[in-house]
Amino acid sequence: MTAHKPFSAVILAAGKGTRMRSDTHKILHALAGRPLLGWVLDSLAPLSPDHTVVVTGSGREQVENYLKQVDLPVTSVTQEEQLGTAHAVAQAKSALKDFKGDIVVLYGDVPLVQPKTIKALLERLHHEDKPTVAVLAFRPDDPRQYGRIVTDKTAHIQKMVEYKDASEEERAITLCNSGLLAIRAHDLWPLLSRVQNNNASGEYYLPDIVMLALSEGRQAVTVDAEAWEVSGVNNRAELASLESLWQNRKRQDVMKDGASLIAPETVWFSYDTEIGRDVIIEPQVYFGRNVKVANGVTIHSFSHIEGADIKENVEIGPFARLRPGAEIAEKAKIGNFVEIKKSKIEKGAKVNHLTYIGDATIGAGSNIGGGTITCNYDGFNKSRTEIGEKAFIGSNSALVAPVRIGAGAIIAAGSTITHNVPDDSLAIARSEQENKALWAKKFRQRKKKK
């Protein structure tokens, strides 16, 4: 989906975000497990921008630290004073002074704009009429808080007006300004230099470049977007609303792709969750980041899954927890109140209940009895437990790592295993049972005499 013409992106992320009431920068709050800014960068990635410039301000250290972790090459510049969106974009000039292509302006708190929409916005600059500015427009359910765009029948802008300044006729228009726009670099910088701050807020507003272009007899146009794509986040309630919107869309996509969600509204996905066909997901299941679920899997209620790779025809839960590094092979079973971390459960193995498996490999066809614990941490280091194929681990066993249980071996219930067990061997590591005849009766009699 690479853009046909050279382009650069400017992402505005300098706002203080005070309405979030948080020590975390607003654009680093997570939507479906990924920071808001990460969504914007991810939408740009398939378009291969020549440059991506993030304009930071308040809390810039947090933003810059995050940018060091992303794959897309990004330059950050700083808006020292919060003097408006036009002033913020102007701070990117130093990073783009030699760039001759198109520039798209995006917002770090508007996370869901799609790559195809950004591409359409940029391509509109190169239609036959060669507009100076292309503005992303939308029609919200409640347009009262948005500025209006007055256009002719060919989507050429005639006027842009804030709601408070609009006439009754203009307020009846439902086409609104998202704030996102595309413009050629050689047009942007001169127009920005002409923006004035003679308004109630004393700020320099980016949309003013549209009216400046129109005043010079140049053209500006709109490109339509769905309202959900340009929904922004200013507070936690809006973040929750956007999370709900995204989750609903994801649930619909998962079901369209062939999975069954018994109670869709109770299942929560992350941005990168992959679900195969003929998967059944019961109510109240949570997917954290980096989860892949293959075809034919059943996930029972109240399971919590993150960082896990689940292969075909596996059964999970109910009340199972899969943590990062869990690899569950074909036809394995992970039952209720089982926790798996950094472990591989091989084909057909069963871990049915009340068990912790960490830093381990469970061989194909093995059975892990209820109450089994892999004791993988000695207070300083993690060690591994290796269990061979078709081994049987009796209930309430403690496997003290590092330790290897051979293929076909049997561990007697209640054992604490501290040494390797050879293949096909029986290991018993518990005190020998001793029965004392009539001891209980005598004990009760003594107690009654007191």
Swiss-Prot record:
The protein's required cofactors: Mg(2+)
Cofactor, free-text remark: Binds 1 Mg(2+) ion per subunit.
Protein residues bound to UDP-N-acetyl-alpha-D-glucosamine: 12-15, 26, 79, 84-85, 107-109, 147, 162, 177, 234, 323, 341, 356, 367
Region (Pyrophosphorylase): 1-236
Active site: H353
Source superkingdom: Bacteria
Major location (coarse): cytoplasm
EC number: 2.7.7.23, 2.3.1.157
Residues annotated as binding Mg(2+): D109, N234
One Gene Ontology term, aspect cellular component: cytoplasm
Record key words, sorted: Acyltransferase, Cell shape, Cell wall biogenesis/degradation, Cytoplasm, Magnesium, Metal-binding, Multifunctional enzyme, Nucleotidyltransferase, Peptidoglycan synthesis, Repeat, Transferase
GO molecular function, one term: UDP-N-acetylglucosamine diphosphorylase activity
Residue ranges, annotated region (Linker): 237-257
Region described as N-acetyltransferase: 258-450
Catalytic reactions on record: alpha-D-glucosamine 1-phosphate + acetyl-CoA = N-acetyl-alpha-D-glucosamine 1-phosphate + CoA + H(+); N-acetyl-alpha-D-glucosamine 1-phosphate + UTP + H(+) = UDP-N-acetyl-alpha-D-glucosamine + diphosphate
Record text on subunit structure and interactions: Homotrimer.
HAMAP family linked to this entry: GlmU
NCBIfam families (alphabetical): glmU, PRK14353.1
Membership in a protein family: In the N-terminal section; belongs to the N-acetylglucosamine-1-phosphate uridyltransferase family. In the C-terminal section; belongs to the transferase hexapeptide repeat family.
Full protein name: Bifunctional protein GlmU
